[in-house]
Amino acid sequence: MLVSVLVILFVPWHQESNFSLVNNTSMHYVRARVLSVDAESLQSDDLEPGRVAGAQEITVQILSGSLKGQTVTLTNYVTRSVNVVCKEGLRIILCIDTPENAEAYYTVYNYDRGGGLLLIFGLFIGIVLVVGGKRGGFSLLGLAYTVFVIFAFLIQAVYYGWSPALAGFLTVLLTGAASVYLIGGPTRKTVAAFLATMAGVLCAAVIYTVCAAALHLSGYNLDTAESLILIQNQTGLHVSGLIFCAVIVAALGAVMDVAVSVSSSLQEIHQLNPDRSAKELMHSGMNIGKDMIGTMTNTLILAFVGSALTTVILLKGYGYDMALLLNSDYVAIEVTEGIAATLGVILTVPLASAISAWLFTLEAKKPLQSNPSKKKRRTGCLARRFSSLFFQNLPVKAHSSRCLPNGNCLSR
């Protein structure tokens, strides 16, 4: 893990580029606190009870940036899409536009959610540590490493022209190995879970590749393809492989969950009953995995449906009929991603069962040894003979012994 972090941080593996889709050099975002609401004209929204619309005259104090400490007065426009209602003491994000040869223009961008997010993260970390203990701490370390690899390596590599498939598989390899090792340590269970995870992700990748070829899908079918092509012209971004990369990264979490659960269960069964054969262990793993398949399948499908819900509603609002909706690029991409990831999870169950059963029952053949009790008796007899040669004059307890032709000695 440490080596990969150092490589990602210090090796110049990407080219520098200052390309941006928009020219926002004149815009700055700073934190601010509302000192007072000087005047307001707000009306209730008839279509959405509890929301208001209108305008407010507010005075704010800037808390960050080069203008820290200054006080400004501005108009806050409250609309349905930008609905930030200011009150005294509220912390907000302020947008400062400073074009050339013009006065600075201030607008309320959004709520300052930094403190709330820190509180939520702290609560999450605390619960994981309390419930999970030491292993919970290792899982948090694995999560931090995963986030680091995604933002510091995957996004940067794909943006600057790396193959999305290569960058995606390297990300899966690094994060999968680190997460599984931190959870299980250097054990056969860890090896089994890691191999099953890689095999499951590979299955998801193969299934997506076949489905994408059959449905004529690529990154150019994304809604954001036009903007991505502009980036491609400047940085060498490979638009066509973006969906493939997204599928294998999205499938990693669920596949790893199933692989670790199955391998851990089979390790426990093997420790309680070491005489079970590999076939019996695999059968037990399949029985355990069948219950997991139903819940994990629902989880993945519902996750993809939830992410696509608002877009499908929007398409329906445009008057798309069912046939047109089902044949749209967006629905085809979402369905293909969901099916590929789900089938990868399902196939992980037999893969994890087979790999775990094989590894747990893999024992080195031990050479045949003579009866240890006979060896011990022979050793004792030789010891007494050795003692009689060198310690004849020492007073010892009287005893007599008779050695048989086979080397065993009888004492009386």
What spans do the regions from the language model cover?
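Hydrophobic secretory-pathway targeting helix
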Residues: 1-24
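Structural detector for short beta-strands of small beta-barrel domains
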Residues: 26-54
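Extended, hydrophilic extramembrane loops/domains of integral membrane proteins
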Residues: 78-115
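Transmembrane alpha-helical segments that form the functional core of multipass membrane systems
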Residues: 122-128, 134-229, 239-250
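Pore-lining and gate-forming transmembrane alpha-helices of multi-pass membrane transport proteins
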Residues: 193-197, 201, 232-233, 237-249, ...
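Helical hairpin unit composed of two closely spaced alpha helices linked by a short loop
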Residues: 252-262, 266-312, 319
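Hydrophobic alpha-helical transmembrane segments of membrane transport and translocation systems
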Residues: 303-375
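Positively charged N-terminal leader segments that act as targeting/secretion signals
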Residues: 367-368, 375-390, 394, 398-399, ...
